[in-house]
């Protein structure tokens, strides 16, 4: 979890996908996040947190439904949404904070 804390405290925006392996919408979100990762390159971070394996982190950020997406910058959440989101929406949210 030290790596997670380093990432969210970065001056680069970090999109965190709180997901579960059994979640249908999470599985649909995964390829969109992979494409987003390649599009933003090193200007932003995109990471996935399995809520079943990291329950304390999910609880800390009050994740009640999945997928939940949170953009962090300098350790602070600057955008949050639940459910499936398209590439253009996610890319725009990250670019707002670059």
Please place each PLM-identified region on the residue numbering.
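Typically the conserved alpha-helix immediately C-terminal to a functionally engaged Cys/Sec
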Residues: 27-40
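Chalcogenol-based redox active-site neighborhoods
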Residues: 60-61, 87
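A short beta-strand-turn-helix
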Residues: 1-13, 55
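Hydrophobic beta-strand anchors of alpha/beta hydrolase catalytic cores
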Residues: 15-16, 46, 69
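Non-catalytic, surface beta->alpha helical segment in thiol-disulfide oxidoreductase systems
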Residues: 73-98
